[in-house]
């Protein structure tokens, strides 16, 4: 049996402001830093250790990983930073308040943009300053692979090459792997691992800063998965994530 640990970054400044974030590189709040420290403490107390970690190229995930490493005394851990683990790109919604957007377009439309599998939000214009083309962190990524908007289907297609070419081989080799990423890049991976249908994935909500443990068989098929921590608090956090895109 293999174990894989996933963690969504701690609360970011735009999580706190209920704004669509996507590829915008916002930082953690004080609460987000505390969530990351607590995640590291939970993992340490439960006896976990790691051989390698994967994260995105966005600071809220990177800093979450730092805090987990710090609390676990694993600052030496090899880390792979990949744009493929970035949050889903929210296109022209990037920076908008979710509740205000729902009030303007309706709860149902915003739910489709946030959680449906194959309907992306309106795209950014290529000349928009939020477009990734001139960002140095993507200088080595072919321009045609850089998104101006994404649906979850696009995010799955972006994440899976990293899983197949690097993460899965690391797990199979016996390495203890930690992935610190984002709500939708983790939803994309979980959809693949658990075989969740395109319709059912709408209901999957991942709380900030809570370790999610996957136990996998020899074929890397899930045996079971579970969150570490106070289960009632985790359920409340998941419900709060689900409510973020509603007008009222």
UniProtKB/Swiss-Prot annotation:
Annotated site residue numbers, Transition state stabilizer: 182
GO terms of molecular function: phosphoglycerate mutase activity
Residue ranges of the TM segments: none
SUPFAM superfamilies on file: Phosphoglycerate mutase-like
Catalytic reaction equation(s): (2R)-2-phosphoglycerate = (2R)-3-phosphoglycerate
Enzyme type, top EC level: isomerase
GO biological process: gluconeogenesis; glycolytic process
Binding residues annotated for substrate, in chain numbering: 8-15, 21-22, 60, 87-90, 98, 114-115, 183-184
Keywords: Gluconeogenesis, Glycolysis, Isomerase
Active site: 9, 87
Pfam families cross-referenced by the UniProt entry: His_Phos_1
Annotated metabolic or biological route of this protein: Carbohydrate degradation; glycolysis; pyruvate from D-glyceraldehyde 3-phosphate: step 3/5
HAMAP family from the UniProt entry: PGAM_GpmA
Its biological purpose: Catalyzes the interconversion of 2-phosphoglycerate and 3-phosphoglycerate.
Self-association and partners: Homodimer.
Family: Belongs to the phosphoglycerate mutase family. BPG-dependent PGAM subfamily.
Name of the protein: 2,3-bisphosphoglycerate-dependent phosphoglycerate mutase
Annotated source species: Burkholderia ambifaria (strain ATCC BAA-244 / DSM 16087 / CCUG 44356 / LMG 19182 / AMMD)
């Amino acid at each position: 049996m293999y174990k894989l640990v996933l963690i969504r970054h701690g609360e970011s400044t735009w999580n706190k402001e209920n704004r669509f974030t996507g590829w915008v590189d916002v930082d953690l709040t004080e609460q987000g830093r505390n969530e990351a420290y607590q995640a590291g403490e939970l993992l340490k107390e439960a006896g976990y250790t790691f051989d390698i970690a994967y994260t995105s190229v966005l600071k809220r995930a990177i800093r979450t990983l730092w805090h987990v490493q710090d609390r676990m005394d694993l600052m030496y851990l090899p880390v792979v930073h990949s744009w493929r683990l970035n949050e889903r790109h929210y296109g022209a919604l990037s920076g908008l308040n979710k509740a205000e957007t729902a009030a303007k377009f309706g709860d149902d439309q915003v739910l489709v943009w946030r959680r449906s599998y194959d309907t992306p939000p309106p795209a950014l214009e290529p000349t928009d300053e939020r477009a990734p083309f001139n960002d140095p962190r993507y200088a080595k990524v072919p321009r045609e692979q850089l998104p101006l908007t994404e649906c979850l289907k696009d995010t799955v297609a972006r994440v899976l090459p990293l899983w197949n070419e690097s993460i899965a081989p690391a797990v199979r080799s016996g390495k203890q792997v930690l992935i610190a990423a984002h709500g939708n890049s983790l939803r994309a991976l979980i959809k693949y691992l658990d075989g969740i249908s395109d319709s059912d994935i709408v209901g999957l909500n991942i709380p900030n800063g809570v370790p999610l443990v996957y136990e996998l068989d020899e074929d890397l098929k899930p045996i079971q998965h579970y969150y570490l921590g106070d289960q009632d608090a985790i359920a409340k956090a998941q419900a709060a994530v689900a409510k973020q895109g509603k007008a009222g």
